């Protein structure tokens, strides 16, 4: 299996804090994969999450793409951003369909590692807690393993292209999300979040290698 993406792609490993790694990337003129390293525990809120109260003791930043909160911990998630310019053959005007191809890449990568995965091709299914917690809902192009969400995808578009932000879970604690966001009733939120998502039974390195190999 090749160690990098196809020649049509540029692989970059930016450095910085989680907040810095969420900064605008500027005009998108080519296909790029950004592999981001998480150095400190950080709760990342979606662009529409305003006035959210978060428990003390953790860094909090806001991303420019939508969806609910994502908890990033070192070693707990494989965070990959994918940049696609407008007009590329991978570009899809229909936002509801625009992430399907990316979900299929993740599913193919997981298949290489012996994990059966399903790409959600239906509409957004936020459930009760999806507006607050990314992994409590299911959106188009996101990936489920044994009925639980394991890869989340959000996107931000501008005139130049799309930035897809992917988080593949290597660890998951619904209890911690309930505590950080103060969700109530606690028992109901705990049960929902613990069953809604689950970590992948793979290591970050092989998963990244397989993901890069399956990029079109």
Describe the residue ranges of each PLM region:
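Active-site loop/lid in soluble adenylation, ligation, and acyl-transfer enzymes
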Residues: 1-56, 61-63, 69, 83, ...
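Short, conserved charged micro-motifs
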Residues: 54-55, 90-95, 176-178, 206
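Short glycine/proline-enriched loop/turn "hinge" motifs that connect secondary-structure elements
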Residues: 69-75, 159
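Internal, conserved structured core segments that host functional sites
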Residues: 79-134, 139-140
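Aromatic/basic-lined ligand-recognition segments
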Residues: 133-155
């Amino acid at each position: 299996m090749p160690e990098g993406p196809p020649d049509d792609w540029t692989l970059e490993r930016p450095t910085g804090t989680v907040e810095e790694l969420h900064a605008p990337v500027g005009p998108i003129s080519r296909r790029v994969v950004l592999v981001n390293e998480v150095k400190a525990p950080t709760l990342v809120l979606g662009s529409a999450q305003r006035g959210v109260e978060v428990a003390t003791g953790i860094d909090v930043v806001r991303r420019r793409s939508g969806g609910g909160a994502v908890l990033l911990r070192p070693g707990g998630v494989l965070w990959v951003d994918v940049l696609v310019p407008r007009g590329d053959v991978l570009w899809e005007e229909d936002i509801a369909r625009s992430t399907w191809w990316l979900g299929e890449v993740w599913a193919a990568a997981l298949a290489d590692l012996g994990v059966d995965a399903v790409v959600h091709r239906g509409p957004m299914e936020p459930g009760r807690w999806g507006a607050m917690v990314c992994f409590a809902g299911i959106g188009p192009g996101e990936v489920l393993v044994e009925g639980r969400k394991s890869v989340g995808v959000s996107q931000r578009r501008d005139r130049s292209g799309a930035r897809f932000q992917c988080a593949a879970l290597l660890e998951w604690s619904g209890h911690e999300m309930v505590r950080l966001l103060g969700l109530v009733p606690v028992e109901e939120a705990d049960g929902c979040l613990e069953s809604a998502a689950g970590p992948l039974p793979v290591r970050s390195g092989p998963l990244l290698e397989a993901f890069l190999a399956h990029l079109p």
